Amino acid sequence: MNASSRNVFDTLIRVLTESMFKHLRKWVVTRFFGHSRQRARLVSKDGRCNIEFGNVEAQSRFIFFVDIWTTVLDLKWRYKMTIFITAFLGSWFFFGLLWYAVAYIHKDLPEFHPSANHTPCVENINGLTSAFLFSLETQVTIGYGFRCVTEQCATAIFLLIFQSILGVIINSFMCGAILAKISRPKKRAKTITFSKNAVISKRGGKLCLLIRVANLRKSLLIGSHIYGKLLKTTVTPEGETIILDQININFVVDAGNENLFFISPLTIYHVIDHNSPFFHMAAETLLQQDFELVVFLDGTVESTSATCQVRTSYVPEEVLWGYRFAPIVSKTKEGKYRVDFHNFSKTVEVETPHCAMCLYNEKDVRARMKRGYDNPNFILSEVNETDDTKM
Protein backbone atom coordinates (compact mmCIF):
# COMPACT_ATOMS: atom_id res chain seq x y z
CA MET A 1 0.00 0.00 0.00
CA ASN A 2 1.53 3.29 -1.11
CA ALA A 3 1.52 6.53 0.89
CA SER A 4 -1.44 8.14 -0.93
CA SER A 5 -3.64 5.08 -0.47
CA ARG A 6 -2.66 4.91 3.19
CA ASN A 7 -3.64 8.58 3.67
CA VAL A 8 -7.01 8.02 2.00
CA PHE A 9 -7.62 4.95 4.15
CA ASP A 10 -6.66 6.82 7.35
CA THR A 11 -8.94 9.73 6.41
CA LEU A 12 -11.84 7.36 5.77
CA ILE A 13 -11.31 5.61 9.11
CA ARG A 14 -11.17 8.94 10.92
CA VAL A 15 -14.38 10.20 9.28
CA LEU A 16 -16.23 6.97 10.09
CA THR A 17 -14.98 7.03 13.67
CA GLU A 18 -16.06 10.65 14.18
CA SER A 19 -19.46 9.93 12.63
CA MET A 20 -20.02 6.89 14.84
CA PHE A 21 -18.92 8.81 17.93
CA LYS A 22 -21.26 11.69 17.06
CA HIS A 23 -24.25 9.38 16.63
CA LEU A 24 -23.37 7.48 19.81
CA ARG A 25 -23.16 10.70 21.80
CA LYS A 26 -26.47 11.88 20.36
CA TRP A 27 -28.11 8.57 21.29
CA VAL A 28 -26.76 8.69 24.84
CA VAL A 29 -27.95 12.27 25.34
CA THR A 30 -31.37 11.48 23.92
CA ARG A 31 -31.70 8.19 25.79
CA PHE A 32 -30.65 9.32 29.26
CA PHE A 33 -31.15 13.08 29.25
CA GLY A 34 -33.65 13.73 26.49
CA HIS A 35 -36.79 13.36 28.59
CA SER A 36 -35.69 16.01 31.07
CA ARG A 37 -34.93 18.45 28.27
CA GLN A 38 -38.18 17.95 26.40
CA ARG A 39 -40.72 20.70 26.69
CA ALA A 40 -43.98 19.66 28.34
CA ARG A 41 -46.93 19.70 25.95
CA LEU A 42 -50.65 19.33 26.48
CA VAL A 43 -51.41 17.70 23.11
CA SER A 44 -49.04 15.19 21.53
CA LYS A 45 -48.20 15.18 17.84
CA ASP A 46 -50.77 12.45 17.18
CA GLY A 47 -53.53 14.34 19.01
CA ARG A 48 -53.59 12.61 22.39
CA CYS A 49 -54.11 14.84 25.42
CA ASN A 50 -51.39 14.71 28.06
CA ILE A 51 -53.48 15.41 31.13
CA GLU A 52 -54.07 13.58 34.37
CA PHE A 53 -56.95 13.94 36.83
CA GLY A 54 -56.12 13.58 40.50
CA ASN A 55 -58.12 13.47 43.73
CA VAL A 56 -61.36 12.56 41.96
CA GLU A 57 -64.03 11.74 44.53
CA ALA A 58 -65.69 8.34 44.61
CA GLN A 59 -69.04 9.87 43.67
CA SER A 60 -67.49 11.37 40.56
CA ARG A 61 -66.01 8.00 39.59
CA PHE A 62 -69.48 6.45 39.83
CA ILE A 63 -70.59 8.73 36.98
CA PHE A 64 -68.46 6.69 34.59
CA PHE A 65 -70.56 3.61 35.39
CA VAL A 66 -73.78 5.56 34.88
CA ASP A 67 -72.58 6.43 31.37
CA ILE A 68 -71.60 2.82 30.75
CA TRP A 69 -71.84 3.01 26.94
CA THR A 70 -69.24 5.77 26.58
CA THR A 71 -67.06 4.09 29.19
CA VAL A 72 -67.04 0.81 27.25
CA LEU A 73 -66.31 2.60 23.96
CA ASP A 74 -63.35 4.45 25.48
CA LEU A 75 -61.78 1.28 26.86
CA LYS A 76 -58.69 -0.14 25.22
CA TRP A 77 -59.07 -3.22 23.07
CA ARG A 78 -57.54 -5.61 25.60
CA TYR A 79 -60.02 -4.56 28.28
CA LYS A 80 -62.91 -4.58 25.84
CA MET A 81 -62.16 -8.11 24.64
CA THR A 82 -61.76 -9.26 28.25
CA ILE A 83 -65.22 -7.89 29.06
CA PHE A 84 -66.60 -9.44 25.86
CA ILE A 85 -65.35 -12.93 26.67
CA THR A 86 -66.17 -12.66 30.38
CA ALA A 87 -69.73 -11.49 29.68
CA PHE A 88 -70.56 -14.52 27.55
CA LEU A 89 -68.69 -17.16 29.53
CA GLY A 90 -69.95 -15.73 32.80
CA SER A 91 -73.58 -15.69 31.70
CA TRP A 92 -73.36 -19.23 30.30
CA PHE A 93 -71.83 -20.57 33.50
CA PHE A 94 -74.21 -18.61 35.74
CA PHE A 95 -77.31 -19.94 34.02
CA GLY A 96 -75.70 -23.37 33.90
CA LEU A 97 -75.61 -23.29 37.69
CA LEU A 98 -79.28 -22.25 37.75
CA TRP A 99 -80.27 -25.10 35.43
CA TYR A 100 -78.27 -27.49 37.59
CA ALA A 101 -80.06 -26.14 40.67
CA VAL A 102 -83.45 -26.67 39.02
CA ALA A 103 -82.54 -30.26 38.18
CA TYR A 104 -81.15 -30.81 41.67
CA ILE A 105 -84.22 -29.42 43.44
CA HIS A 106 -86.59 -31.40 41.22
CA LYS A 107 -84.47 -34.53 41.79
CA ASP A 108 -83.86 -35.06 38.07
CA LEU A 109 -80.19 -36.03 38.46
CA PRO A 110 -79.13 -39.71 38.17
CA GLU A 111 -77.82 -39.66 41.73
CA PHE A 112 -81.42 -39.46 42.98
CA HIS A 113 -82.40 -42.61 41.00
CA PRO A 114 -85.63 -41.21 39.52
CA SER A 115 -88.38 -43.69 38.62
CA ALA A 116 -89.15 -44.71 35.08
CA ASN A 117 -92.29 -42.56 34.87
CA HIS A 118 -90.51 -39.49 36.32
CA THR A 119 -90.75 -36.38 34.08
CA PRO A 120 -87.75 -34.06 34.55
CA CYS A 121 -87.83 -30.28 34.17
CA VAL A 122 -85.12 -30.52 31.51
CA GLU A 123 -84.48 -33.68 29.57
CA ASN A 124 -80.98 -35.23 29.65
CA ILE A 125 -79.34 -33.01 32.27
CA ASN A 126 -77.09 -35.44 34.13
CA GLY A 127 -74.69 -33.05 35.86
CA LEU A 128 -73.05 -29.65 35.87
CA THR A 129 -71.41 -30.17 32.48
CA SER A 130 -74.65 -31.02 30.72
CA ALA A 131 -76.34 -28.07 32.50
CA PHE A 132 -73.62 -25.74 31.18
CA LEU A 133 -74.06 -27.11 27.64
CA PHE A 134 -77.83 -26.61 27.85
CA SER A 135 -77.29 -23.04 29.03
CA LEU A 136 -74.96 -22.43 26.07
CA GLU A 137 -77.44 -23.95 23.59
CA THR A 138 -80.29 -21.87 25.01
CA GLN A 139 -78.53 -18.51 25.00
CA VAL A 140 -76.94 -18.74 21.56
CA THR A 141 -80.01 -20.55 20.13
CA ILE A 142 -78.05 -23.53 18.82
CA GLY A 143 -80.87 -25.96 19.53
CA TYR A 144 -79.31 -29.42 19.09
CA GLY A 145 -82.53 -31.03 20.34
CA PHE A 146 -80.95 -33.55 22.72
CA ARG A 147 -81.71 -31.46 25.82
CA CYS A 148 -85.03 -29.62 26.08
CA VAL A 149 -87.40 -28.06 28.62
CA THR A 150 -90.60 -29.91 29.50
CA GLU A 151 -93.87 -28.48 30.76
CA GLN A 152 -93.40 -30.12 34.13
CA CYS A 153 -91.79 -27.09 35.89
CA ALA A 154 -92.95 -23.49 35.70
CA THR A 155 -89.59 -22.44 37.16
CA ALA A 156 -87.74 -23.95 34.21
CA ILE A 157 -90.05 -22.21 31.72
CA PHE A 158 -89.55 -18.86 33.45
CA LEU A 159 -85.77 -19.39 33.55
CA LEU A 160 -85.76 -20.23 29.83
CA ILE A 161 -87.60 -17.00 28.98
CA PHE A 162 -85.37 -14.92 31.24
CA GLN A 163 -82.14 -16.34 29.81
CA SER A 164 -83.33 -15.84 26.23
CA ILE A 165 -84.15 -12.17 26.84
CA LEU A 166 -80.93 -11.51 28.75
CA GLY A 167 -78.92 -13.27 26.05
CA VAL A 168 -80.35 -10.98 23.37
CA ILE A 169 -79.44 -7.94 25.49
CA ILE A 170 -75.87 -9.15 26.02
CA ASN A 171 -75.45 -9.95 22.32
CA SER A 172 -76.79 -6.56 21.25
CA PHE A 173 -74.69 -4.58 23.72
CA MET A 174 -71.39 -6.37 23.25
CA CYS A 175 -71.60 -6.72 19.46
CA GLY A 176 -72.75 -3.11 19.19
CA ALA A 177 -69.82 -1.96 21.31
CA ILE A 178 -67.34 -3.83 19.10
CA LEU A 179 -68.91 -2.45 15.91
CA ALA A 180 -69.04 1.09 17.29
CA LYS A 181 -65.40 0.84 18.36
CA ILE A 182 -64.34 -0.22 14.86
CA SER A 183 -66.40 2.42 13.06
CA ARG A 184 -65.48 5.38 15.27
CA PRO A 185 -64.41 8.45 13.24
CA LYS A 186 -61.31 8.58 15.41
CA LYS A 187 -59.78 6.00 13.06
CA ARG A 188 -60.61 8.19 10.06
CA ALA A 189 -58.68 10.99 11.73
CA LYS A 190 -55.53 8.86 11.55
CA THR A 191 -55.49 9.39 7.77
CA ILE A 192 -55.22 13.18 8.21
CA THR A 193 -51.63 14.23 8.73
CA PHE A 194 -49.97 17.52 9.62
CA SER A 195 -46.47 18.65 8.77
CA LYS A 196 -43.80 17.91 11.34
CA ASN A 197 -42.89 21.59 11.65
CA ALA A 198 -44.58 24.93 11.27
CA VAL A 199 -42.73 27.65 9.35
CA ILE A 200 -42.71 31.44 9.41
CA SER A 201 -42.07 33.34 6.19
CA LYS A 202 -43.53 36.03 3.95
CA ARG A 203 -46.63 35.25 1.94
CA GLY A 204 -48.44 37.85 -0.11
CA GLY A 205 -46.24 40.57 1.36
CA LYS A 206 -47.23 39.63 4.92
CA LEU A 207 -45.41 37.65 7.56
CA CYS A 208 -47.29 34.40 8.12
CA LEU A 209 -47.09 31.21 10.15
CA LEU A 210 -47.71 28.29 7.80
CA ILE A 211 -48.68 24.66 8.42
CA ARG A 212 -49.25 21.92 5.86
CA VAL A 213 -52.06 19.38 6.23
CA ALA A 214 -52.98 16.47 3.96
CA ASN A 215 -55.78 13.95 3.53
CA LEU A 216 -54.32 10.50 2.77
CA ARG A 217 -57.65 9.13 1.52
CA LYS A 218 -59.45 10.01 -1.68
CA SER A 219 -62.75 10.38 0.17
CA LEU A 220 -63.30 13.97 1.25
CA LEU A 221 -64.10 15.60 4.57
CA ILE A 222 -67.34 17.55 4.23
CA GLY A 223 -67.58 21.01 5.80
CA SER A 224 -63.99 21.09 7.02
CA HIS A 225 -63.11 23.87 9.45
CA ILE A 226 -59.62 24.60 10.75
CA TYR A 227 -58.58 26.75 13.70
CA GLY A 228 -55.96 26.94 16.42
CA LYS A 229 -55.39 27.68 20.10
CA LEU A 230 -52.22 29.16 21.55
CA LEU A 231 -51.59 27.83 25.06
CA LYS A 232 -49.25 29.81 27.25
CA THR A 233 -48.80 30.95 30.82
CA THR A 234 -50.01 34.49 31.44
CA VAL A 235 -50.28 36.76 34.45
CA THR A 236 -53.35 38.98 34.74
CA PRO A 237 -53.17 42.60 35.97
CA GLU A 238 -54.62 41.33 39.25
CA GLY A 239 -51.63 39.03 39.73
CA GLU A 240 -53.40 35.76 38.88
CA THR A 241 -51.27 33.22 37.02
CA ILE A 242 -53.12 31.27 34.33
CA ILE A 243 -51.17 28.15 33.37
CA LEU A 244 -53.08 27.17 30.22
CA ASP A 245 -54.40 30.44 28.90
CA GLN A 246 -56.06 29.89 25.52
CA ILE A 247 -55.72 32.45 22.74
CA ASN A 248 -57.61 32.02 19.47
CA ILE A 249 -55.47 31.66 16.36
CA ASN A 250 -57.21 32.15 13.02
CA PHE A 251 -55.94 29.96 10.20
CA VAL A 252 -57.02 30.50 6.61
CA VAL A 253 -56.38 29.10 3.19
CA ASP A 254 -56.65 31.24 0.09
CA ALA A 255 -60.39 30.54 0.01
CA GLY A 256 -61.05 30.94 3.76
CA ASN A 257 -61.07 28.60 6.74
CA GLU A 258 -64.40 26.80 6.25
CA ASN A 259 -65.70 24.28 3.70
CA LEU A 260 -62.19 23.43 2.52
CA PHE A 261 -61.78 21.51 -0.74
CA PHE A 262 -59.61 18.88 0.88
CA ILE A 263 -58.64 16.82 -2.15
CA SER A 264 -54.93 17.67 -2.07
CA PRO A 265 -52.52 18.85 0.66
CA LEU A 266 -53.29 22.37 1.84
CA THR A 267 -51.00 24.99 3.29
CA ILE A 268 -52.87 26.91 5.95
CA TYR A 269 -51.46 30.15 7.31
CA HIS A 270 -51.95 32.63 10.10
CA VAL A 271 -51.18 36.28 9.34
CA ILE A 272 -48.85 37.75 11.96
CA ASP A 273 -50.21 41.27 12.30
CA HIS A 274 -50.75 43.68 15.19
CA ASN A 275 -53.55 41.47 16.57
CA SER A 276 -51.48 38.28 16.48
CA PRO A 277 -49.84 36.92 19.66
CA PHE A 278 -46.74 36.23 17.52
CA PHE A 279 -46.33 39.92 16.62
CA HIS A 280 -43.82 40.70 19.38
CA MET A 281 -41.78 37.55 18.81
CA ALA A 282 -38.58 37.51 16.79
CA ALA A 283 -36.33 34.89 15.24
CA GLU A 284 -33.75 35.39 18.00
CA THR A 285 -36.26 35.04 20.85
CA LEU A 286 -38.54 32.33 19.43
CA LEU A 287 -36.86 29.44 21.24
CA GLN A 288 -37.01 31.36 24.51
CA GLN A 289 -40.80 31.56 24.36
CA ASP A 290 -43.03 29.22 26.36
CA PHE A 291 -46.11 28.35 24.32
CA GLU A 292 -47.85 25.49 22.58
CA LEU A 293 -49.79 25.95 19.36
CA VAL A 294 -52.64 23.42 19.06
CA VAL A 295 -54.24 23.09 15.63
CA PHE A 296 -57.71 21.56 15.12
CA LEU A 297 -59.40 20.30 11.97
CA ASP A 298 -63.10 19.43 12.20
CA GLY A 299 -65.04 17.76 9.42
CA THR A 300 -67.67 15.20 8.47
CA VAL A 301 -66.57 11.88 6.99
CA GLU A 302 -68.04 11.55 3.51
CA SER A 303 -68.62 7.78 3.68
CA THR A 304 -70.16 7.53 7.17
CA SER A 305 -71.46 11.08 7.87
CA ALA A 306 -69.72 10.93 11.25
CA THR A 307 -68.04 14.03 12.64
CA CYS A 308 -64.34 13.72 13.42
CA GLN A 309 -61.66 16.02 14.78
CA VAL A 310 -57.94 15.91 14.06
CA ARG A 311 -55.48 17.79 16.24
CA THR A 312 -51.77 18.27 16.66
CA SER A 313 -49.48 20.72 18.41
CA TYR A 314 -46.28 22.67 17.87
CA VAL A 315 -43.83 23.91 20.48
CA PRO A 316 -41.23 26.66 19.80
CA GLU A 317 -38.59 24.10 18.76
CA GLU A 318 -40.93 22.92 16.00
CA VAL A 319 -41.51 26.39 14.52
CA LEU A 320 -38.89 27.26 11.88
CA TRP A 321 -38.39 30.99 11.26
CA GLY A 322 -37.28 31.90 7.75
CA TYR A 323 -38.42 28.76 5.96
CA ARG A 324 -41.20 27.74 3.58
CA PHE A 325 -42.52 24.37 2.48
CA ALA A 326 -41.15 22.69 -0.60
CA PRO A 327 -43.60 22.13 -3.50
CA ILE A 328 -45.20 18.69 -3.55
CA VAL A 329 -47.89 18.94 -6.28
CA SER A 330 -46.87 18.46 -9.90
CA LYS A 331 -48.56 17.60 -13.17
CA THR A 332 -47.72 14.41 -15.06
CA LYS A 333 -47.54 13.95 -18.81
CA GLU A 334 -50.90 12.18 -18.71
CA GLY A 335 -52.51 15.31 -17.29
CA LYS A 336 -52.91 14.00 -13.73
CA TYR A 337 -51.87 15.85 -10.61
CA ARG A 338 -49.26 14.00 -8.58
CA VAL A 339 -48.59 14.56 -4.87
CA ASP A 340 -45.09 13.70 -3.68
CA PHE A 341 -45.34 13.02 0.05
CA HIS A 342 -41.58 12.65 0.26
CA ASN A 343 -41.43 16.46 0.40
CA PHE A 344 -44.49 16.84 2.63
CA SER A 345 -42.55 18.15 5.66
CA LYS A 346 -39.50 19.30 3.72
CA THR A 347 -38.67 22.99 4.16
CA VAL A 348 -36.57 25.45 2.16
CA GLU A 349 -34.79 28.41 3.71
CA VAL A 350 -35.92 31.79 2.37
CA GLU A 351 -35.16 35.42 3.15
CA THR A 352 -37.50 36.54 5.91
CA PRO A 353 -37.62 39.57 8.25
CA HIS A 354 -36.41 38.57 11.69
CA CYS A 355 -39.53 40.03 13.35
CA ALA A 356 -43.02 41.11 12.34
CA MET A 357 -42.58 44.53 13.88
CA CYS A 358 -39.57 45.16 11.64
CA LEU A 359 -41.58 44.27 8.54
CA TYR A 360 -44.40 46.65 9.35
CA ASN A 361 -41.99 49.44 10.39
CA GLU A 362 -40.21 49.02 7.06
CA LYS A 363 -43.50 49.34 5.23
CA ASP A 364 -44.34 52.51 7.17
CA VAL A 365 -40.97 54.05 6.30
CA ARG A 366 -41.44 53.25 2.62
CA ALA A 367 -44.93 54.73 2.67
CA ARG A 368 -43.69 57.96 4.29
CA MET A 369 -40.82 58.26 1.81
CA LYS A 370 -43.26 57.74 -1.05
CA ARG A 371 -45.38 60.63 0.27
CA GLY A 372 -42.31 62.86 0.32
CA TYR A 373 -41.36 63.00 3.99
CA ASP A 374 -39.68 60.68 6.38
CA ASN A 375 -40.45 62.40 9.68
CA PRO A 376 -43.69 61.04 11.13
CA ASN A 377 -43.94 64.00 13.56
CA PHE A 378 -43.62 66.65 10.86
CA ILE A 379 -46.85 68.59 10.22
CA LEU A 380 -47.25 70.92 7.26
CA SER A 381 -49.19 74.04 8.27
CA GLU A 382 -50.44 76.92 6.13
CA VAL A 383 -48.66 80.25 6.84
CA ASN A 384 -50.48 83.53 6.11
CA GLU A 385 -48.71 86.84 5.47
CA THR A 386 -48.97 89.45 8.22
CA ASP A 387 -47.98 93.09 8.33
CA ASP A 388 -44.67 92.16 9.93
CA THR A 389 -43.79 89.76 7.17
CA LYS A 390 -44.77 91.94 4.24
CA MET A 391 -41.86 93.40 2.30
From Swiss-Prot:
Q: Which post-translational modifications are recorded for this protein?
A: Phosphorylation at Ser-44 by SGK1 is necessary for its expression at the cell membrane.
Q: Where in the cell is it found?
A: Cell membrane
Give the positions annotated as glycosylation sites.
117
Say if the entry is tagged with keyword Transport: yes
Q: Where, by residue number, does the polypeptide cross the bilayer?
A: 78-102, 156-177
Disease with which this protein is associated in UniProt: Bartter syndrome 2, antenatal: A form of Bartter syndrome, an autosomal recessive disorder characterized by impaired salt reabsorption in the thick ascending loop of Henle with pronounced salt wasting, hypokalemic metabolic alkalosis, and varying degrees of hypercalciuria. BARTS2 is a life-threatening condition beginning in utero, with marked fetal polyuria that leads to polyhydramnios and premature delivery. Another hallmark is a marked hypercalciuria and, as a secondary consequence, the development of nephrocalcinosis and osteopenia.
- Spell out the protein name for this chain: ATP-sensitive inward rectifier potassium channel 1
Organism in which the protein naturally occurs:
Homo sapiens (Human)
- Record lineage: Eukaryota, Metazoa, Chordata, Craniata, Vertebrata
> What is the gene called?
KCNJ1
